[in-house]
A protein has these predicted regions:
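Bacterial N-terminal signal peptides that target proteins for export
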Residues: 1-8
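Bacterial N-terminal signal peptides
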Residues: 8-18
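Surface-exposed strand-loop-strand hairpins of Gram-negative outer-membrane beta-barrel proteins
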Residues: 34-54, 134-137
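Gram-negative (and chloroplast) outer-membrane scaffold detector with strong preference
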Residues: 26-28, 57-129, 136-139, 149, ...
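Sec/Tat signal peptide C-region and signal peptidase I cleavage site
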Residues: 19-23
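Outer-membrane beta-barrel translocator domains and adjoining extracellular loop/strand segments
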Residues: 39-45, 78-85, 124-132, 169-176
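Outer-membrane pore/translocation modules
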Residues: 24-27, 36-47, 183, 190
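Subset of outer-membrane beta-barrel
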Residues: 46-51, 138, 148-157, 162-172, ...
Length: 197
């Protein structure tokens, strides 16, 4: 027969046993609006700029507060469109994530987070004039944050804000890494549907 002392010691031992932290993989399709900076700037004879964006993020959050993320966003008609063609901006960045899970990593929970990263910003226009058409690949950095709210173990929503800016001219140890004809910058606000695995 077990004594009350042995049972108490066993219960305390069970409660103090570390539970392994669970890593999360997040798939987040999103849509939103661009604003500020170059968002809404018409190029040449273009009209009807669109500030709409859509894309997808894939994040891996470790068992604590740190994670990594890949983010791809597309903004159609970013510089406007003509009767002949249009324009668009594509961003593809890799980011470091810091996010604190309130409520745990299963069931209902809230996770505010911040991101910082770098990647590619591709600007392209095909207005049919040849003179004002652009096709540029620039290095960009991004920073921002937001909050994810989970309604259960597998699904939630994300409110996200990010700022993107291309590097003007970047040199490391005298070696040119990026040479940009001009800075492109804008902010992106989006709403995403989060699938947690």
């Amino acid at each position: 027969m077990l004594s009350p002392r042995a049972i108490g010691t066993a219960l305390i031992g069970i409660m103090l046993t570390a539970v392994p932290a669970r890593a999360d993989t997040l798939l987040i399709p999103f849509f939103g609006v661009n604003f500020g900076g170059d968002a809404g700037t018409e190029f040449s004879d273009a009209f009807d700029t669109s500030q709409f964006n859509w894309g997808v993020s894939i994040a891996f959050m470790g068992g604590g507060i740190f994670g990594v993320e890949g983010d791809i966003g597309y903004s159609p008609d970013f510089y406007g469109k003509t009767d002949v063609g249009g324009s668009g901006v594509l961003t593809a960045t890799g980011n470091l994530v810091i996010g604190i899970p309130f409520g745990g990593q299963q069931g209902f929970g809230i996770r505010p987070y911040g991101i910082v990263g770098a990647g590619l910003l591709k600007s392209k226009s095909d207005f049919g004039t040849g003179v004002t058409d652009i096709d540029e690949n620039d290095l960009t950095w991004s920073a921002g944050g937001g909050v994810m709210m989970f309604f259960g173990t597998r699904a939630g929503i994300r409110f996200d804000f990010r700022y993107f800016q291309t590097f003007d001219d970047l040199e490391i140890l005298g070696v040119p890494i990026a040479q940009s004809p001009g800075k492109v910058d804008f902010s992106r606000a989006s709403l995403g549907f989060v699938l947690r695995f």
